[in-house]
From Swiss-Prot:
Pfam families: Seryl_tRNA_N (PF02403), tRNA-synt_2b (PF00587)
Organism classification: Bacteria, Pseudomonadati, Campylobacterota, Epsilonproteobacteria, Campylobacterales
Protein name: Serine--tRNA ligase
UniProt-listed NCBIfam families: serS
Record keywords, A-Z: Aminoacyl-tRNA synthetase, ATP-binding, Cytoplasm, Ligase, Nucleotide-binding, Protein biosynthesis
Record text on subunit structure and interactions: Homodimer. The tRNA molecule binds across the dimer.
Task of the protein: Catalyzes the attachment of serine to tRNA(Ser). Is also able to aminoacylate tRNA(Sec) with serine, to form the misacylated tRNA L-seryl-tRNA(Sec), which will be further converted into selenocysteinyl-tRNA(Sec).
Sample GO molecular function, one term: ATP binding
The species this protein was found in: Campylobacter jejuni subsp. jejuni serotype O:2 (strain ATCC 700819 / NCTC 11168)
Residue spans crossing the bilayer: none
Length: 411
């Protein structure tokens, strides 16, 4: 959640940045009106309280005590009424603020959508083939690695069954990713895939993205859309010791998304599924540590792709494509020869204190004061899309898939 004091004190500046992040101008106008109303009603409340304080002290020596008592009683009623007005405005303001995204960093390019993201660099060269490379779903079906028909039969569309070497390769990737991330100093944690509403709120999924979540009927439980949610919230409501930071974690999980708004996109294959697997990086840092840890996380995910021999590129997301909780995001896109283009395989984001304010994660700074931490997250990597990338990049003209050397010991 945004710092409401900063929003109120620097409204025009912050509102401009939020417009770049596609926040509706009517919402910003409503916020401005609420801030003005709240200021007015608080002044009135303070005047009533000042009256009460002043004349309560004079009651003992007043000549007409009964008259003053009546005035104080009447004023007390006004204080209660005015307090209710202030509380109602504060609640309305906070409710709207819950759906306002994070402010983009100054380094984030202003842009409307993904077409205005900025390429930072390319890593490795895409492979060349003396034949037309196939897409992963063709290879997967011919090798009996991917069973779409039975996935749909037992579930619905956008579900798939992995079989034989395809399932083994997926498992090998998970183990390799965890080991790689641990070698870079990230502690492995294993968390529940079902979390409560407060946890979903803490990282920004609720209330704005409720319609994209799978919820358990009659229970305050949701299936996670990313392990960023439970891992970040491991420290919700806590005050951490300064010397424990940064905390760097990696986690494997299944992820569940309704993919609302994705109709017609990636309808074939396993690029976009309702259930998929991911190995995540999550860090909790002091404010002054978050930029360097962001670079560590980005380097970790990029080096992981390089270790698998997968060509990829770094993209700085523009304001219009930036996620709800992120102040800055760099996407990694892997080369898929079957599609003849780069596709997203990782997003590394610095959320600054946005999630920490919602989840109430603080640390005791050097001055002994409680201060909000910064939170960061990133995929290292999306397992299904890495499987897709290996299938397409390591295929031969006979339709066989060769396994990267670093994965062979995991079979």
């Amino acid at each position: 959640m945004l710092d409401l004091k900063n929003l109120q004190n620097n409204f025009d500046e912050v509102a401009k940045k939020l417009k770049n992040k596609k926040v509706d101008e009517n919402i910003l106008k409503k916020l401005a009106e609420l801030f003005a109303s709240l200021k007015k009603e608080k002044i009135a409340l303070e005047e009533f309280q000042a009256f009460q304080n002043k004349f309560s002290k004079e009651l003992a020596t007043a000549e007409d005590k009964e008259s003053l008592k009546a005035k104080l009683s009447e004023n007390k009623s006004k204080i209660n009424e005015q307090s209710a007005k202030v509380n109602a405005l504060e609640n309305e303001l906070e409710e709207i603020a819950h759906a306002i995204p994070n402010i983009p960093d100054e380094c984030v390019p202003v842009g409307e959508d993904e077409n205005e993201n900025v390429e930072l660099k390319k890593v490795l060269n895409p492979p060349s083939f003396d034949f037309t490379p196939k897409e992963h779903f063709e290879l997967g079906e011919s090798l009996n690695w991917l069973d779409f028909m039975r996935g749909v039969k037992i579930s619905q569309s956008r579900f798939c069954v992995l079989k034989n070497e395809g399932a083994l390769l997926s498992r090998a990737l998970v183990n390799y990713m965890i080991d790689f991330n641990r070698s870079r100093g990230f502690e492995f944690v294993n968390v529940p895939f079902l979390v409560n509403g407060a946890t979903m709120f803490g990282t920004g999924q609720l209330p704005k993205f409720k319609e994209d979540m799978y919820k358990v009927d009659d229970e305050d439980l949701y299936l996670i859309s990313t392990s960023e949610i439970p891992v970040t919230n491991l420290y919700s409501g806590e005050i951490l010791a300064s010397e424990t930071l940064p905390i760097k974690m990696t986690c494997y999980s299944a992820c569940f998304r309704k993919e609302a708004g994705s109709a017609g996109r990636d309808t074939r294959g396993i690029i976009r599924q309702h259930q998929f697997e991911k190995v995540e990086l999550v860090s909790i840092t002091k404010p002054e540590q978050s930029d360097s840890v962001f670079n560590e996380m980005l380097e970790c995910a990029s080096d992981l792709l390089s270790s698998l021999g997968l060509a990829h590129r770094h993209l700085m997301l523009c304001t219009g494509d930036l996620g709800f909780s992120a102040a800055k995001t760099v996407d990694l896109e892997v080369w898929l020869p079957g599609q003849n283009k780069y596709r997203e395989i990782s997003s590394v984001s610095n959320c600054r204190d946005f999630q920490a304010r919602r989840a109430k994660i603080r640390y005791k700074n050097e001055q002994g004061k409680n201060e909000l931490v910064h939170t960061l997250n990133g995929s290292s990597l999306a397992v299904g899309r890495t499987l897709v990338a290996i299938m397409e990049n390591y295929q031969d003209k006979e339709g066989k898939i060769h396994i990267p050397d670093v994965l062979k010991k995991y079979f």
